[in-house]
């Protein structure tokens, strides 16, 4: 009995001595603006695309309409390639500020464009900012978060994206009757971009980046702001176990692919690849037409999908630091596979069957819900945890480039595959990728819940 009491008191004492969340939360909240902009810009052209094509003179040109939507992905790919270098050269805070600039400029060009060329240029610039911002935001949030809150704060990135997608849809309702209303949608996006650029001036720099630069005194000062003076010394002692700034050399691509940490880089790329090959973006793309066939308006369809996404994000926020990243990933991918199996079943039923649309809708909403619980937020958080401090920014940039390439390929080939092999086989391929992801995660992913970044890095050091 006394032993149990000692254990309870010890647990309570440990809980009471954890760094307060109020110190780090404001900085995380500012970084989350990047993910809001990410969601907003990916969804902002979906609803007003017809009005844009009419006003700019390319109505009926499906190639031009497709470019307006997808050129953002090309810009994001380019941005992701340089995001690691920018984050390492200028620091996380300055990198986030720099990512806001092309989003500000690009959105302004889109809002004032008089031709297709102007719209494409603006979307390309916005995409470049989106390629730089999200990976740096994930780095920043991971590096400034206390260990016991890192999962919770990491989930806020996905919530920001969900809110951005919902905002892109809902913002059109009150202004849709105004001539050229789509221009207002682009102008509105400049507000959070400006807030991001200005607010980062008051945010702390990543202590990990400062230490990597050999600026130890500044790193300790930032740790005090994030954790409080009580915990800063211990955190600095942990930080000193990593490679010192003077030992840091430039990280080359060949080192990421063939160096001592190539295994974790390969794992990170695989997780992002499986995330895209699960079919999530194809589901988002095709959801409106499926809902319309069921007699539901496309606007309402987007709201349903958006709500399912936000509910999943909220669940992830609550569970990430309780049951861990690995469990969430396994449950998420497995449930996504089962949800996709429902859509395979629906695709095999007769279109006239009264239950076919219910199966489609149930499978689709469950798929989005379970994606948002694990497969959506966990990879970006997990990778910033398992990558060593020395290669973290460059490795994250490489993995994000894989993400954007596959995002583009799935979007490009989805409708063609539907026509050539039918929905049964397409959904079956997505289903198989989800179950393959379960096996990959179960065999290769380390649980990082509650561990400091230093503990994770030491645990993953290759045995030479």
Segments (PLM) and residue ranges:
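Short arginine-rich
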Residues: 229-234, 459-463
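Alpha-helical transmembrane bundle of multi-pass membrane proteins
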Residues: 1-224, 245-464
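Short, well-structured alpha-helical segments
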Residues: 232-244
């Amino acid at each position: 009995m006394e032993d149990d009491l000692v254990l309870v008191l010890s647990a309570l004492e440990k809980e009471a001595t954890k760094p307060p969340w109020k110190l780090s939360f404001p900085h995380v909240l500012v970084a989350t603006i990047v993910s809001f902009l990410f969601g907003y810009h990916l969804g902002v052209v979906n609803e007003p695309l017809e009005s844009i094509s009419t006003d700019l003179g390319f109505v009926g040109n499906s190639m031009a309409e497709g470019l307006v939507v997808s050129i953002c992905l090309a810009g994001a790919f380019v941005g992701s390639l340089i995001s690691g270098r920018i984050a390492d050269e200028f620091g996380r805070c300055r990198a986030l500020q720099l990512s806001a600039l092309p989003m500000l400029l690009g959105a302004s060009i889109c809002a004032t464009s008089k031709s297709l060329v102007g719209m494409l240029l603006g979307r390309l610039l916005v995409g470049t900012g989106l390629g730089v911002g999200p990976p740096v935001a994930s780095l920043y949030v991971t590096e400034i978060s206390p260990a016991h809150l890192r999962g919770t704060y990491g989930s806020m990135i996905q919530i920001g994206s969900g809110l951005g997608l919902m905002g892109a849809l809902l913002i059109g309702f009150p202004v849709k009757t105004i001539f050229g209303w789509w221009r207002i949608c682009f102008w509105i996006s400049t507000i959070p971009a400006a807030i991001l650029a200005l607010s980062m001036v008051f945010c702390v720099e990543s202590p990990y980046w400062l230490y990597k630069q050999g600026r130890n005194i500044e790193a300790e000062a930032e740790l005090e702001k994030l954790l409080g003076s009580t915990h800063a010394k211990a955190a600095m002692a942990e930080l000193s176990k990593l490679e010192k700034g003077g030992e840091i050399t430039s990280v080359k691509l060949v080192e990421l692919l063939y160096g001592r940490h190539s295994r974790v880089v390969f794992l990170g790329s695989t997780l992002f690849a499986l995330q895209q090959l699960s079919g999530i973006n194809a589901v988002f793309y095709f959801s409106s037409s499926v809902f319309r066939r069921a007699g539901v308006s496309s606007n309402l369809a987007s709201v349903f999908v958006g709500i399912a996404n936000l509910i999943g994000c909220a669940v992830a926020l609550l569970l990430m630091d309780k049951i861990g990243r690995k469990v969430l990933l396994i449950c998420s991918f497995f449930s996504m596979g089962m949800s996709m199996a429902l859509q395979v079943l629906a695709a095999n039923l007769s279109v006239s069957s009264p239950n076919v649309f219910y199966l489609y809708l149930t499978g689709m909403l469950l798929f989005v819900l379970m994606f948002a619980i694990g497969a959506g937020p966990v990879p970006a958080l997990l990778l910033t945890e398992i990558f060593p401090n020395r290669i973290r920014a460059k490795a994250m940039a490489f993995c994000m480039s894989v993400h954007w390439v596959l995002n583009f390929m799935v979007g490009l080939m989805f409708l063609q595959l539907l026509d050539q092999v039918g929905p049964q086989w397409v959904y079956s391929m997505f289903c198989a990728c989800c179950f393959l992801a379960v096996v990959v995660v179960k065999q290769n992913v380390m649980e990082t819940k509650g561990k400091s970044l230093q503990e994770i890095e030491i645990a993953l050091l290759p045995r030479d």
